[in-house]
Amino acid sequence: MNAPAPKPGLVIVDKPAGMTSHDVVSKLRRAFSTRKVGHAGTLDPMATGVLVVGIERGTRFLAHMVASTKAYDATIRLGAATSTDDAEGEVISTTDASGLDHSTILAEIVNLTGDIMQKPTKVSAIKIDGKRAHERVRDGEEVDIPARPVTVSVFDVLDYHVDGEFYDLDVRVHCSSGTYIRALARDLGNALQVGGHLTALRRTEVGPFTLNDATPLSKLQENPELSLNLDQALTRSYPVLDITEDEGVDLSMGKWLEPRGLKGVHAAVTPSGKAVALIEEKGKRLATVFVAHPNTL
């Protein structure tokens, strides 16, 4: 007899350093005994912190988290530029940054805050004509990724110190999805004409999920448990619309409801607490965006 499929939902992982996001997925596939595992929002190997992983039908919910805001704690080293904009790459230039004026640094940080155009780092997972940018760079190709709009809502300096010819900044960043913290380090260094790169990165938040929700990967391998079932995931991520049990049955079958003047996506929740679906008004219909509990009978 085949083992029953694991329950669907999300696992909030505290990713360790030295491992790709795909490595985490591979280990959780083994731990949960299912191929249906995926992640939202890639973390670089050197980065640690919040990685949201979907299990079973939870993988389909991940597509509705792509636009989530994110928060990071990071360390930026001014005085050296690298090929990858982080400590994993080769140093390509150095300039003594020990004499930088702190007020000048803060002024340039202001210029990198708000709605900005950011050129993603070349060594990234962005696809160019079907091939990831980091693969093209590895194969010796010249890569030029166009700048794209991102929002940096918080870029605060928590601490700073001079280390020889380098000027290190401990920073906290809140930003839109698609923002590269490595690129912020690079651009800050370029603006100050000394070069810059990232030496540490820890993601502290993805949408509504924080480090308080996260479990170390090693513990999940020993005891594979969901962090949130689908009902909890939907209601943590979206405002709730209370519906009747009958309406829940209709939505579970892909039917639509009469419009109610809603703005944006809501989680439709029955009196029994089941988050049946994500719904959104489209014209004269209140239609499903994602069905968490489909009724295929």
UniProtKB/Swiss-Prot annotation:
<comment type="similarity">
    <text>Belongs to the pseudouridine synthase TruB family. Type 1 subfamily.</text>
</comment>
<keyword id="KW-0819">tRNA processing</keyword>
<dbReference type="GO" id="GO:0003723">
    <property type="term" value="F:RNA binding"/>
</dbReference>
<protein>
    <recommendedName>
        <fullName>tRNA pseudouridine synthase B</fullName>
        <ecNumber>5.4.99.25</ecNumber>
    </recommendedName>
</protein>
<dbReference type="InterPro" id="IPR032819">
    <property type="entry name" value="TruB_C"/>
</dbReference>
<dbReference type="Pfam" id="PF09142">
    <property type="entry name" value="TruB_C"/>
</dbReference>
<keyword id="KW-0413">Isomerase</keyword>
<dbReference type="GO" id="GO:0031119">
    <property type="term" value="P:tRNA pseudouridine synthesis"/>
</dbReference>
<dbReference type="InterPro" id="IPR002501">
    <property type="entry name" value="PsdUridine_synth_N"/>
</dbReference>
<dbReference type="InterPro" id="IPR015947">
    <property type="entry name" value="PUA-like_sf"/>
</dbReference>
<dbReference type="InterPro" id="IPR015225">
    <property type="entry name" value="tRNA_psdUridine_synth_fam2_C"/>
</dbReference>
<dbReference type="GO" id="GO:0160148">
    <property type="term" value="F:tRNA pseudouridine(55) synthase activity"/>
</dbReference>
<dbReference type="Pfam" id="PF01509">
    <property type="entry name" value="TruB_N"/>
</dbReference>
<dbReference type="InterPro" id="IPR036974">
    <property type="entry name" value="PUA_sf"/>
</dbReference>
<feature type="active site" description="Nucleophile">
    <location>
        <position position="44"/>
    </location>
</feature>
<comment type="function">
    <text>Responsible for synthesis of pseudouridine from uracil-55 in the psi GC loop of transfer RNAs.</text>
</comment>
<dbReference type="GO" id="GO:1990481">
    <property type="term" value="P:mRNA pseudouridine synthesis"/>
</dbReference>
<dbReference type="InterPro" id="IPR014780">
    <property type="entry name" value="tRNA_psdUridine_synth_TruB"/>
</dbReference>
<dbReference type="Pfam" id="PF16198">
    <property type="entry name" value="TruB_C_2"/>
</dbReference>
<dbReference type="InterPro" id="IPR020103">
    <property type="entry name" value="PsdUridine_synth_cat_dom_sf"/>
</dbReference>
